[in-house]
């Protein structure tokens, strides 16, 4: 029987494909249903965020940073204020640190929920998509009552947070934690042992421990491959050391392992929030406020311009002639900023290290030899947001 060798078919997936999680284009070479090669095309959402940073003071730049990973905006704000804090050695009051941790973990839950829904929809399960939006709305309600915004919160400031938590907010947050824990169990009962789900994710997109380290992966991509690496434990930032929680990890390295890591992380986040809510101390919520309270009623911080004109010290805050790399454990991995100060209010250089951009590099290697339908499963398990990939 004669067999005719056919040329590979080139298919362009995206940039407006419903499963692309933003404007990503994949140029895929196919032999029948099998993927021979995959070439990601980036840059559709490039806005020059690093260059904008060089022409703005840190406080002016804060509203921009929430547009990188617009589903976990607290983390982009945290890293933007942490960098100048470390650079100029600014102390953050204890209360502010606890408020930050609560906000960061709520943001992590919201991000993981909005990963889970579309990931399941990509695989073909529509129902969880509606479940996760129900719980995510509650997180956004908490954000709205504390910061005034549901997304793009603009809440973090150099030396603390913009405003203190409103009256009754801590109780509302505790109620949410009590409500949400059983919901995670409900998701797991619904999804984890579903035979169709298992067939779509088990043994798909396997990353070995060595590959995960060599490619510089971070977050669930790294911990799903058996590496117990979480920057909250490694870098000891904010007040995570004072709370009792454990790193979530799996050793299989496939899409199922990454799913299990993120489900476990939501549980740990609730645990962290509950402890922080119970242990949160009193006192000032921001560094300038702390100085004002320390110096009493005759302090210059009590003057009209410091009280009412946007807390004057922030807009004219000069970055020392120094350089520093600061990172946080964002929901998608290691989010870092390399900041170089030049003794002016503007940074001389602000290099962003987004987790999505680095994690996406391994995609062509993972999809080679797989079926076309597996591309969506693998891409979904990486969890990218094009806002931070393209910046």
UniProtKB/Swiss-Prot annotation:
One of its GO terms (cellular component) is chloroplast thylakoid membrane. The keyword Magnesium does not apply. One of its GO terms (molecular function) is oxidoreductase activity, acting on NAD(P)H, quinone or similar compound as acceptor. InterPro entries: NADH_Q_OxRdtase_suD, NADH_UbQ_OxRdtase_49kDa_CS, NDH1_su_D/H, NiFe-Hase_large. One of its GO terms (biological process) is photosynthesis, light reaction. It comes from the Eukaryota. It catalyses: a plastoquinone + NADH + (n+1) H(+)(in) = a plastoquinol + NAD(+) + n H(+)(out); a plastoquinone + NADPH + (n+1) H(+)(in) = a plastoquinol + NADP(+) + n H(+)(out). Pfam families: Complex1_49kDa. It is found in: Plastid, Chloroplast thylakoid membrane. Gene3D superfamilies: Cytochrome-c3 Hydrogenase, chain B. It is an enzyme of class 7 (translocase). It is a peripheral membrane protein. Keywords: Chloroplast, Membrane, NAD, NADP, Plastid, Plastoquinone, Quinone, Thylakoid, Translocase, Transport. Its EC number is 7.1.1.-. NDH is composed of at least 16 different subunits, 5 of which are encoded in the nucleus. NDH shuttles electrons from NAD(P)H:plastoquinone, via FMN and iron-sulfur (Fe-S) centers, to quinones in the photosynthetic chain and possibly in a chloroplast respiratory chain. The immediate electron acceptor for the enzyme in this species is believed to be plastoquinone. Couples the redox reaction to proton translocation, and thus conserves the redox energy in a proton gradient. NCBIfam families: NuoD, PRK06075.1, PRK07415.1. Belongs to the complex I 49 kDa subunit family. This is NAD(P)H-quinone oxidoreductase subunit H, chloroplastic. It comes from Chaetosphaeridium globosum. The lineage of its organism: Eukaryota, Viridiplantae, Streptophyta, Coleochaetophyceae, Coleochaetales. The gene is ndhH.
């Amino acid at each position: 029987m004669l067999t005719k060798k056919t040329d590979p078919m080139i298919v362009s997936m995206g940039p407006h494909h419903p499963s692309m999680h933003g404007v990503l284009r994949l140029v895929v070479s196919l032999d029948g249903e099998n993927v021979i090669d995959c070439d990601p095309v980036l840059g559709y959402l490039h806005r020059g965020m690093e260059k904008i940073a060089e022409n703005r003071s840190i406080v002016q730049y804060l509203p921009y940073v929430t547009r990188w990973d617009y589903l976990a905006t607290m983390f982009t704000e945290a890293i933007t204020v942490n960098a100048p804090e470390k650079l100029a050695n600014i102390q953050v009051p204890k209360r502010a640190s606890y408020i930050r941790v609560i906000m960061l973990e709520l943001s992590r839950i919201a991000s993981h929920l909005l990963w889970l829904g579309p990931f399941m929809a990509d695989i073909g399960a529509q129902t969880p998509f509606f479940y996760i939006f129900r719980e995510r709305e509650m997180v956004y309600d908490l954000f709205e009552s504390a910061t005034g915004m549901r997304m793009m919160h603009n809440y973090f400031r150099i030396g603390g947070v913009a405003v203190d938590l409103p009256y009754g907010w801590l109780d509302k947050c505790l109620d949410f934690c009590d409500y949400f824990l059983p919901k995670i169990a409900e998701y797991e009962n619904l999804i984890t042992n579903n035979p169709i789900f298992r067939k779509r994710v088990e043994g798909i997109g396997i990353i070995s421990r060595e590959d995960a380290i060599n490619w510089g992966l971070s977050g669930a991509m790294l911990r799903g491959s058996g590496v117990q690496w979480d920057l909250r434990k490694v870098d000891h930032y904010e007040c995570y050391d004072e709370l009792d929680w454990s790193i979530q990890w799996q050793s299989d390295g496939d899409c199922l392992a990454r799913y299990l890591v993120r489900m476990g992380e939501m549980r740990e986040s609730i645990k962290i929030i509950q402890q922080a809510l119970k242990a949160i101390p009193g006192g000032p919520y921001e560094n300038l406020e702390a100085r004002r309270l320390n110096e009493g009623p005759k302090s210059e911080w009590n003057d009209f311009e410091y009280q009412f004109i946007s807390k004057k010290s922030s807009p004219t805050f000069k970055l020392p002639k120094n350089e520093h790399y600061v990172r946080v454990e964002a929901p998608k991995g290691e989010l870092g900023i390399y900041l170089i100060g030049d003794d002016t209010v503007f940074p001389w250089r602000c290099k962003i290290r987004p987790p999505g951009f680095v994690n996406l590099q391994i995609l062509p290697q993972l999809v080679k030899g797989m079926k076309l339908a597996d591309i969506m499963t693998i891409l979904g398990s990486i969890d990218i947001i094009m806002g931070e990939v393209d910046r």
